[in-house]
Every structure is written in structure tokens, then in C-alpha cells.
Amino acid sequence: MKRNLPISFLFLVTMFIVMRWQGTGLITPQSPKGVLDLEFAKTPERFHQLQLFWNHKKVLQNIYLDFLFIVAYTWFLITACKAADNTKSNLFSGFAISAGAFNVLENFLMILVWNGRFEPSLLQIVYYASAIKFLLAGIVVGYLILSLFGLFKRESSH
């Protein structure tokens, strides 16, 4: 397990760099946050504004690459939770898996919306799936930071 932590971290950093590099074309004056602007585009008007300025193919490439990023951050967060080796590790590993699952849902819905299978209600679901994903991932990161300071009981030795 300890060997997986640096490997999963390297995979995470690699995917983060790839996503930033590939997503630079999505950063415009109308979308300073790149693909995050699509994730949080609650209204059809905002969605259509993004469509005007973005390359259709680059958006889809970014979303498809995000599936690898999901694997990377979920693997890293689970591995880090297990490395924390305390009584809450399994709970927070579950939160990491849930964050990844919400991200997968969000990506599938964004693909549907971006490809013209558009229902305004889908934007609301994408918005909330994205918000829940970030909340869960933030909770896990917070847990990991607190674990570094020993604020959770260690697992008893078997």
C-alpha cells in the first residue's frame, strides 16, 4: 500500500498537468475557469454562451481526459486514506469513491448536453453533481490534512 501512494500521486500530478495543458483553449475572457464554467453553467443561456466561444472537439477531449483524471484522484485519495491508517480511513475512502462517482455522472451528462441531447434540467443536475463532487473531495482532503496532525485514532494492530 505504501508503494502505491507515490505512484498514485505521480499519476494524479501527471493527469493534472495534462488536463491543464489540454484545457488551455477553454480559458477565455467569457470562461476564465475553463471547463469549470461548463460544470457550473446552470442555465441554457450560459451554456449557449460557452458554446459560442469553445471548440466542440476540444471540449469533448477535455471531458474524456477527465475520466482518467477521475481515476487518478480517486486512486490517490483512497490510497492516502488507507495510508492514514486510522479508524475513519474506510469512511473517507468511501467519500473519495463517491466524489469520483459524482464526477462520472457529471461527465456523462455534460457529454449529452454538449452533443445536443439537451434538456435544460440536465444543467441543474450537472451543477449539483459537480458541487457535491467538490464538497466530498474537499472533505477527504480536509480529513487527510487533519490526519497528518494525528487528530484521529490510529487503527489497532492486528
Where are the regions that the model predicts?
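Hydrophobic alpha-helical transmembrane segments
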Residues: K58-A80, V141
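Interfacial loop at the N-terminal end of multi-pass membrane proteins
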Residues: K2-Q61
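Alpha-helical transmembrane segments of integral membrane proteins
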Residues: L65-F69, S93, S130-A137
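Membrane-interface helix-boundary motifs at transmembrane edges
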Residues: K2, K82-N90, E155-S157
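C-terminal TM-helix exit segments that contain a strictly Trp-centered aromatic cap at the helix terminus
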Residues: I17-G25, F102-V113
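Alpha-helical transmembrane segments of multi-pass integral membrane proteins
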Residues: V104-F152
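Alpha-helical transmembrane segments of multi-pass membrane proteins
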Residues: A96-F102
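Juxtamembrane loop-transmembrane helix junctions in multi-pass integral membrane proteins
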Residues: F53, K57-L60, A84-L91, R117, ...
